[in-house]
Amino acid sequence: MTSSDDIELVRGLVEIPSLSRHEGDAVEWLVARMAERGFRATVDDAGNAVGEIGDGARHVVLLGHIDTVPGDIPVRIEDGELIGRGAVDAKGPLAAFVAAATEKVAGVRVTVVGAVEEESPTSAGARHRARLAAPDWCVIGEPSSWDAVTVAYKGRLALRIALTRDARHGAAPGPTVTEEALAVWTAIRDASDRRTPGADGFARLDCRLEGMSGGTSDGLVERAELRVGYRIPPGIATDELAHEVRTLARGHGGDAHVTVEIVGAEEPARTPRSTPLARAFVGAIADAGGAATFKVKSGTSDMNVLAPAWACPTVAYGPGDSRYDHTPMERLVLDDYVRAITVLKGVLRRAGAPI
């Protein structure tokens, strides 16, 4: 396969809409393209596109997600950039995986997974694969830039807090149910601020009010709802935070009945920079003319699911600038995409001859 074939691969994948939970057309297309390249390709029980190539004792999983967030961006190539929804997050990394693995390496079996529902709270594709036997190495497909490797992601906790109470006349004394909900939010925010005072970036616990509705009533019951999201650094557990929120909500919700529902939760994930896999990337990036750097991310990825489940060397890697994730300007520099394929080939060669 040539570089132009690899560019057509990523362009074709980006051209197929694949909103989270609606990935079927893109999955079938990618399975067909992998089969053409010599992969043993299929759709697994979760709906993931899965391609396996090569034989050998060493097993490397390259898992990227095939779903995208909403947003219709006309797909085109301009000034050496592929523009379109998913070009960076994360069809570019996924296509680079397929392109790199097409070149077989003696003694190495590679499984490429185009995972579904990464952009949904379910992470259904990764969770399905997590139940399988662990590989020797795992690379998660997320934009890091061609010469950088991501070794840590914050965790995530999404909560829905509902307050209900008997309906009251509008002239009745005391706070409204909406005001009680605001008191709950203030207590949660203040407690979060006390957790990591003075911390910046990756070390900081971030807490946001992501949505609120209030004052709804059917004439019998008044309701208010908060949607609260945390980004969690290593050292803080999601169940610990959820317990704290339940205590705070019930203590500051006045006479309303308060329920706290966990909508989604992922523990923080961090992997050492000294693993054979991380060193393989350092060497492969150097061979491609770069100097590797390591990144930590405030978001989450399928690494949060697979790193604790498999307990094997794991990093996230892929071409693209993550500042374009989920934006109307999503674009992938194609030269960087081709460089990333070269780096990934170097990593796979090193898997056949471990450092």
Regions found by a protein language model. Give the residues of each.
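Acidic/His- and Gly-rich active-site-bordering loop/insert found
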Residues: 1-87, 303, 311, 321
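Short beta-strand/turn micro-motifs at beta-sheet edges
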Residues: 72-73, 147-151, 213-219
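Metal-dependent amide/peptide-bond hydrolase catalytic core
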Residues: 143, 157-355
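Short glycine-aspartate micro-motif
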Residues: 61, 82, 136-140, 158-160, ...
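Active-site metal-coordination/substrate-binding segment of hydrolases
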Residues: 57-114, 128, 328
